[in-house]
């Protein structure tokens, strides 16, 4: 009698913050339901079981999702396209736009001011996205000096740290409350399913099947 082969373990990285609430129903549609302790707000655990014994979830910062997956510590993850673009890891494959977590990455500056234009060769920008920001300005012939901040970008112009900021914008309310105005949209952002390329090739029984289930779930939701 042949023994039943157990599926290979899969680690799935999901982000804390704005995308998580929208990601949970999507996970449920592909048959992945977190264990009860995942929803315990007092828990400091970072690794959680699911209803599928071979699949575990890790809940980490959005920027760390890409790093865990790119280096093979997790096989799959969910993260915003802003993070995928910022790191541009060659080891990452982003096969499915999940259609959630919509916002935009924008350039903003003081109300009444103009965006950088022709004739300007240098600008100082406060941002969480230095690589993306430099690329965007370089395409316009402007050298961007990026001040890396992980939060409170909106006060940088007021305190003289930078003339502009590049940050995620949803409603724009935070900009208005800090006397800033959105000047240019750099990119539209949505959440993506990301996969470690090596895991996609080596775990051919499980990982590609999960990718297809996500693709189907997104298609069904859009229908």
From Swiss-Prot:
What are the GO BP annotations of this UniProt entry? Answer: L-histidine biosynthetic process
Localisation? Cytoplasm
Reaction(s) catalysed by this chain's protein? 1-(5-phospho-beta-D-ribosyl)-ATP + diphosphate = 5-phospho-alpha-D-ribose 1-diphosphate + ATP
Q: Which gene encodes it?
A: hisG
What protein am I looking at? ATP phosphoribosyltransferase
| GO cellular component terms, semicolon-separated | cytoplasm
Q: What does this protein do?
A: Catalyzes the condensation of ATP and 5-phosphoribose 1-diphosphate to form N'-(5'-phosphoribosyl)-ATP (PR-ATP). Has a crucial role in the pathway because the rate of histidine biosynthesis seems to be controlled primarily by regulation of HisG enzymatic activity.
Q: What is known of its domains?
A: Lacks the C-terminal regulatory region which is replaced by HisZ.
What are this entry's molecular-function GO terms? ATP binding; ATP phosphoribosyltransferase activity
The record's listing under SUPFAM superfamilies reads: Periplasmic binding protein-like II (SSF53850)
Give the species: Sphingopyxis alaskensis (strain DSM 13593 / LMG 18877 / RB2256)
- State which pathway it belongs to: Amino-acid biosynthesis; L-histidine biosynthesis; L-histidine from 5-phospho-alpha-D-ribose 1-diphosphate: step 1/9
Against PROSITE patterns, the record matches this protein to:
ATP_P_PHORIBOSYLTR
What HAMAP family has UniProt attached to this entry?
HisG_Short (MF_01018)
Subunit composition and interactions: Heteromultimer composed of HisG and HisZ subunits.
């Amino acid at each position: 009698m042949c023994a039943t082969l157990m599926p290979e373990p899969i680690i799935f990285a999901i982000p804390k913050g704005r995308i998580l609430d929208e990601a949970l129903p999507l996970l449920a549609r592909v048959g992945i339901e977190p264990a009860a302790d995942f929803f315990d707000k007092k828990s400091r655990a970072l690794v959680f079981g699911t209803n599928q014994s071979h699949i575990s979830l890790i809940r980490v910062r959005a920027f760390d999702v890409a790093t865990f997956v790119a280096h093979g510590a997790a096989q799959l993850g969910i993260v915003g396209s802003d993070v995928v673009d910022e790191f541009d890891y060659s080891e990452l494959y982003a096969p499915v736009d999940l259609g959630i977590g919509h916002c935009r990455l924008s350039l903003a500056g003081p109300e009444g001011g103009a965006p950088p234009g022709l004739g300007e060769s240098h600008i100082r920008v406060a941002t969480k996205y230095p690589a993306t920001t430099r690329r965007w300005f370089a395409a316009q012939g402007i050298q961007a000096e990026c001040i890396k901040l992980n939060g409170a970008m909106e006060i940088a112009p007021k305190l003289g740290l930078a003339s502009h900021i590049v940050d995620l914008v949803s409603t724009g309310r935070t900009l208005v409350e800090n006397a800033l105005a959105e000047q240019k949209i750099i990119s539209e952002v949505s959440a993506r399913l990301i996969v470690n390329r090596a895991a996609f090739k080596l775990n051919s029984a499980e990982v590609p099947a999960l990718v297809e289930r996500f693709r189907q779930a997104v298609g069904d939701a859009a229908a």
